[in-house]
């Protein structure tokens, strides 16, 4: 009897192990083919950009320094592509000085909410941290909650599980690699915070196809690496946009705005839209 029980348990363990192996293999196969299966969409026709997005971007009281970046960042296109709407609860991960945070705040409006997250700022980036803190003092951004928390901390976002509509990370996923952050933990936290059907939007400077993370010091990352890692968290890639593509960029120079100088805003960038099932 005991031998039968042991044999049964061993057989069950083998079957369970095989099921996990099969699931991981399926995920790997899915991740390796998804990019090709999701063609990039063309820019959204201006007439199809919602008026509330145009109003937010063109608001007279937006900072002039923000507006000077618009041509290189195409915020109307990005916000429309991500489906940002009034009343939504959203998060801006690694918000930096708050350019994207303010746009999100203006679009979601008084019935919406924005979590603006930044990790601790090292000494050389204290000026950005100060700009972020100063921006959030604006009464017009009272729907924004500042989240000063390391990516490795538990409870990255204070939002209740399954409560957010959209999470955005704008040109900073590569920095997770540079700082040695546990990206699987970050993506899992985003997955937990989003509601079913919620969107995870990622924009970043592209490295050459197939380069993986070897060019990370250029502040660039291979698009497929991001796709694979985010899908491993359970997300499905549903859309890609070409609006920030710059084929003239040979992807050999440092994309960081602190180094790019006059070339800032001209990097070849991918925009990925993932959805939580």
What does each model-found stretch correspond to?
Residues 197-206:
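Conserved beta-strand signature within the Rossmann-like core of class I S-adenosyl-L-methionine
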Residues 156-167:
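A short acidic, Gly/Pro-enriched loop at the edge of an enzyme's catalytic core
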Residues 127-158:
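S-adenosyl-L-methionine
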Residues 248-277:
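Core SAM-dependent methyltransferase catalytic element
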Residues 87-96:
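Conserved class I S-adenosyl-L-methionine
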Residues 136-138, 213-240:
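Conserved Class I S-adenosyl-L-methionine
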Residues 53-79, 85:
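Class I SAM-dependent methyltransferase Rossmann-like catalytic core
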Residues 105-106, 182-196:
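A short glycine-rich, Lys/Arg-flanked "PGG" loop and its adjoining helix->strand segment in the class I
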């Amino acid at each position: 009897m005991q031998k039968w029980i042991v044999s049964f348990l061993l057989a069950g363990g083998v079957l369970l192990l095989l099921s996990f192996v099969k699931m991981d293999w399926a995920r790997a196969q899915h991740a390796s083919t998804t990019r090709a299966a999701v063609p990039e969409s063309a820019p959204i026709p201006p007439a199809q950009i919602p008026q509330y997005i145009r109003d937010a971007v063109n608001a007279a009281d937006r900072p002039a320094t923000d507006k000077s970046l618009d041509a290189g960042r195409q915020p109307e296109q990005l916000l429309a592509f991500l489906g940002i709407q009034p009343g939504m609860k959203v998060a801006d991960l690694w918000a930096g000085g708050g350019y994207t945070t303010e746009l999100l705040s203006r679009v979601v409006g008084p019935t919406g909410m924005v979590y603006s997250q930044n990790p601790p700022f090292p000494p050389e980036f204290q000026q950005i941290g100060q700009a972020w803190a100063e921006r959030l003092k604006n009464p017009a951004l009272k729907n924004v909650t500042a989240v000063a928390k390391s990516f490795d901390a538990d409870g990255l976002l204070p939002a209740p599980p399954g409560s957010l509509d959209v999470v955005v990370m704008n040109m900073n996923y590569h920095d997770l690699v540079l700082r040695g952050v546990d990206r699987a933990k970050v993506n899992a936290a985003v997955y937990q915070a989003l509601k079913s059907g919620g969107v995870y939007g990622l924009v970043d400077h592209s490295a050459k196809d197939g380069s993986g993370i070897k060019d990370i010091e250029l502040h660039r990352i291979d698009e497929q690496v991001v796709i694979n890692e985010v899908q491993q968290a359970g997300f499905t890639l549903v859309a890609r946009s070409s609006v920030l593509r710059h084929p003239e960029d040979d992807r050999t120079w440092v994309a960081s705005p602190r180094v790019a100088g006059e070339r800032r805003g001209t990097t070849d960038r991918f925009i990925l839209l993932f959805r939580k099932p």
